[in-house]
Amino acid sequence: MIIPNLPSFFVPLVGLLLPAITMVIFHLYIQNDDIF
């Protein structure tokens, strides 16, 4: 019962979390480039 429910919860979580992590890494890269 857990296996079919897991992707239903995991896919939207990754869909929201992945762009957030990408934005954070991009912001840190811009900030680091600005310091240099």
UniProtKB/Swiss-Prot annotation:
Keywords: Chloroplast, Membrane, Photosynthesis, Photosystem I, Plastid, Thylakoid, Transmembrane, Transmembrane helix. May help in the organization of the PsaL subunit. Belongs to the PsaI family. It is a single-pass membrane protein. The lineage of its organism: Eukaryota, Viridiplantae, Streptophyta, Embryophyta, Tracheophyta. It holds the Pfam family PSI_8. This is Photosystem I reaction center subunit VIII. GO terms for cellular component: chloroplast thylakoid membrane; photosystem I. The keyword Oxidoreductase does not apply. It comes from Picea abies (Norway spruce). GO terms for biological process: photosynthesis. It is found in: Plastid, Chloroplast thylakoid membrane. InterPro entries: PSI_PsaI, PSI_PsaI_sf. The chain crosses the membrane at residues 10-30. The gene is psaI. It comes from the Eukaryota.
